[in-house]
């Protein structure tokens, strides 16, 4: 019984597949839904920040109050847009890196919030804000409404 021989074509095909698979996987974008007011510029800028960081947003331009209530995010953590990603609620100008960390760690929680609209957070940043950055916190919101600090961003 002789050992199977590998043709040049099979070796080449296997090599190309091993290169193509990681490239294809790296291009996979994580989908989320975003509810916002159709005229909100900072919401559009936050979505652009997410899309630059590997997310694909489906935008619902009908405001976010009803979505926030339906998804269980307490009003006191409210902001100008609400998102849903892999079962987590994202409220406000949460940085993409914190959402990526949330999806990696998968804590038992409702989601994340950056209450209000702090200057310097994604979507509230850049030259139109004189590159100012106020201190703010990203909160991990539990289903019972309790919170812990997920990340802190200092004044800059």
Language model features with spans:
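Local sequence-structure signature of Cys/Sec-based thiol-disulfide redox active-site neighborhoods
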Residues: 30-42
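Boundary at the C-terminal end of the N-terminal hydrophobic targeting segment
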Residues: 23-25
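N-terminal secretory signal peptides and thylakoid transit peptides that target proteins
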Residues: 1-18
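Solvent-exposed loop/turn segments at secondary-structure junctions
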Residues: 39-41, 64-66, 89-90, 118-120
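Short phosphate-binding/catalytic loops that engage adenosine nucleotides
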Residues: 55
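Thiol/selenol-based redox catalytic cores and closely related redox-interacting motifs
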Residues: 76-156
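Typically the conserved alpha-helix immediately C-terminal to a functionally engaged Cys/Sec
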Residues: 46-49
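Thiol-based oxidoreductase modules, predominantly thioredoxin-like and allied folds used
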Residues: 58-67, 77
């Amino acid at each position: 019984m002789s050992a199977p021989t590998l043709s040049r074509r099979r070796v080449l095909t296997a090599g190309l597949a091993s290169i193509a698979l990681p490239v294809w996987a790296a291009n996979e974008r994580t989908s989320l839904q975003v509810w916002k007011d159709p005229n909100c510029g900072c919401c559009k800028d936050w979505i652009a920040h997410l899309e630059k960081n590997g997310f694909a947003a489906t935008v619902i331009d009908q405001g976010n109050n009803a979505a926030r209530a339906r998804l269980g995010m307490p009003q006191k953590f409210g902001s100008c847009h609400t998102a849903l990603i892999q079962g987590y609620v994202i409220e406000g100008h949460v940085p993409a890196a914190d959402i990526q960390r949330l999806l990696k760690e998968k804590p038992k929680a409702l989601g994340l919030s950056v209450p209000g609209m702090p200057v310097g957070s994604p979507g509230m940043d850049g030259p139109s804000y004189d590159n100012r950055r106020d201190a703010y916190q990203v909160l991990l919101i539990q289903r019972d409404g309790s919170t812990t600090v997920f990340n802190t961003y200092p004044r800059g």
